[in-house]
A protein has these predicted regions:
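Short, conserved sequence motifs used for protein processing/export or organelle targeting and
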Residues: 1-136
Length: 136
């Protein structure tokens, strides 16, 4: 990410033979991240390697065609990846984005047909009071 944003790993533990990593993503800018236009997105690309450097887990890889591994919206605009508090499988990816819905509740990319958000988990600016912001 560019300036104005922070991310990292707070803690890594092994719990019942499973690797757990507590990561953080913080928006230090003065607006939501990504910004207004609904096609913009920010996602976590996580790779775990073993002691020999072999990849044992990956979530959110960018494919050569620009699509994100695990994001159903790239293949079918009527679907989208939900917000995840935990990533447990490589077909899950944490994507921060807004998804618009039309009057029938279907996902749409048409600004003139959109009447609400179906998903809006964009990162709020640092210092913004989250209790006053409703998550969709």
């Amino acid at each position: 990410m560019g300036r104005g944003h922070a991310f990292g790993v707070r803690e890594v533990t092994i719990n019942e033979g499973r690797l757990e990593a507590d990561v953080f993503v913080e928006n230090l800018g003065g607006h939501k991240l990504p910004t207004a236009y609904p096609s913009r997105r920010v996602w976590l690309h996580v790779t775990v390697r073993d002691g020999a450097g072999r990849k044992v887990f990956e979530s959110g890889a960018l494919r050569p065609d620009g699509s994100i591994q695990g994001n159903p919206n790239d293949a079918d605009p009527a679907t989208f990846e939900p917000h995840h508090d935990e990533i447990r499988a490589n077909n899950q990816v944490q994507i921060y984005e807004s998804i618009l819905g039309d009057a029938n509740g279907a996902a749409t990319t048409g600004l003139l047909t959109a009447v609400r958000y179906l998903k809006d988990n964009r990162l709020l600016p640092h210092g913004f009071e989250k209790r006053s912001e409703e998550r969709v």
